[in-house]
Amino acid sequence: MNLHQTVEHEAAAAFAAAGIAGSPVVLQPTKNAEHGDFQINGVMGAAKKAKQNPRELAQKVADALAGNAVIESAEVAGPGFINLRLRHEFLAQNIHAALNDARFGVAKTAQPQTVVIDYSSPNLAKEMHVGHLRSSIIGDSISRVLEFTGNTVIRQNHVGDWGTQFGMLVAYLVEQQKDNAAFELADLEQFYRAAKVRFDEDPAFADTAREYVVKLQGGDETVLALWKQFVDISLSHAQAVYDTLGLKLRPEDVAGESKYNDDLQPVADDLVQKGLAVEDDGAKVVFLDEFKNKEGEPAAFIVQKQGGGFLYASTDLACLRYRIGRLKAGRLLYVVDHRQALHFEQLFTTSRKAGYLPENAKAEFIGFGTMMGKDGKPFKTRSGDTVKLVDLLTEAVERATALVKEKNPELGADEAAKIGKTVGIGAVKYADLSKNRTSDYVFDWDAMLSFEGNTAPYLQYAYTRVQSVFRKAGEWDATAPTVLTEPLEKQLAAELLKFENVLQSVADTAYPHYLAAYLYQAATLFSRFYEACPILKAEGASRNSRLQLAKLTGNTLKQGLDLLGIDVLDVM
């Protein structure tokens, strides 16, 4: 159930009874549970508009809520707030229903969409580094939530598998007579660095590299065979990283830049035909009045270079048109570094004008900040090099395993390694996903691996605590009526019933940290409930009801963490 929506509906009816129908209710959870479960903040705005005394109007609304099947009490506070306390019978009935529902009371959206989500998308011919982490895990979590809430999700890994860097690589390998050799990703990286130096310093080599790009685009069999070898090696590495991270990305989700190669010229020509793109110094350019350059003139969105070459803009236009036209997307999400915001704003504006992005479809830039080191600079190795993602994840598992062994010296090596991997990978992912994605954040091993505070280990431990209860509980009845009498029982129940609203917020806004904050709040409340309301020592209906609350808490934590892409453990 959507608890927020249910309470808001009751409040709206009370607003109508008080003569202010249609005014925004402005419903929020109370900051202090002693004041109730929710607070209505919309009366003051309605009173100002209606030229009434806000406290008197608030009292009318509160009186209209009296005897309500959902609201136990409505008390006016301050200049016109209304604090609401929910009926324990209402909470108990819905906890019982959620516990006995395969989806834990979370309904699917009434308006499902086909959503194409573009995330991870590394450039190939080099190893993935920490800069690829955020897009990969943020996109994966958003895609999971969208699926769980009833949408059709199409994942797209728009890898950089085309362009000048591949011409450089081919030119270098031919020059070094290594074009028939077998090689690995580490070799490719070494070759690429050497090729880049040659490209920057030797005009003749640069011309040769560009010639190989033309051959690649023209379908030259020898060049294509080398290119495919580069791509296969790179994608194999990327998939191994995705598997370690537990992402849902699969090889069939790869739709790289090369996929749209044949569509680039038709798109450029179409924009000219529609009068959007014009010739400017030999290039095809869309001038956008919505964006100004430093001189205050319309910004240039170049779709084809002088000489006929194409850019990211060309590929992204063709790609967007494909996703709307062929994949039938109603919503497009691009999970990309926030520094690319202007490019995507221009892409969406151009696509809208060209008719590629119809009015009934929505394109969203899901930007994110930078992972920083403790020195406040982008996260690097001590020598200043980019941190390879494989190395980061390996260190996470090693650190977590050492921590697990320290806390549980009796564990066998295999069990400690299994727990260490789950805790380590979960810690890295949660440290990122628990932050507002638009912000930069500091990468801190000690903080993320702590078993206290808003961390994955804390939430994973909360889940194991629930499992421990049921290993000792013996018989209990999930179908028996739920009875709530203690304040913390009611608080925990109300929190668990907010799950649907939180997931819908994440689906609507693409902010996974809302879910992380909710899970931390639920786990913290369960800890307080566990201490204040003995579960196994209680008797009769009280014992059974507390077990029901514990079970639903465990279910919610497990499902919620899974939607963040984080595994749980029965024992830690």
UniProtKB/Swiss-Prot annotation:
Residue span of motif 'HIGH' region: 122-132
Listed EC numbers: 6.1.1.19
Signal sequence region: none
Listed GO biological process terms: arginyl-tRNA aminoacylation
A GO term for molecular function: ATP binding
GO cellular component: cytoplasm
InterPro entries on file: aa-tRNA-synth_I_CS (IPR001412), Arg-tRNA-ligase (IPR001278), Arg-tRNA-synth_N (IPR005148), Arg-tRNA-synth_N_sf (IPR036695), ArgRS_core (IPR035684), DALR_anticod-bd (IPR008909), Rossmann-like_a/b/a_fold (IPR014729), tRNAsynth_Ia_anticodon-bd (IPR009080)
Similarity field: Belongs to the class-I aminoacyl-tRNA synthetase family.
Subunit-level organization: Monomer.
Protein name according to UniProt: Arginine--tRNA ligase
Organism name: Neisseria gonorrhoeae (strain NCCP11945)
Gene: argS
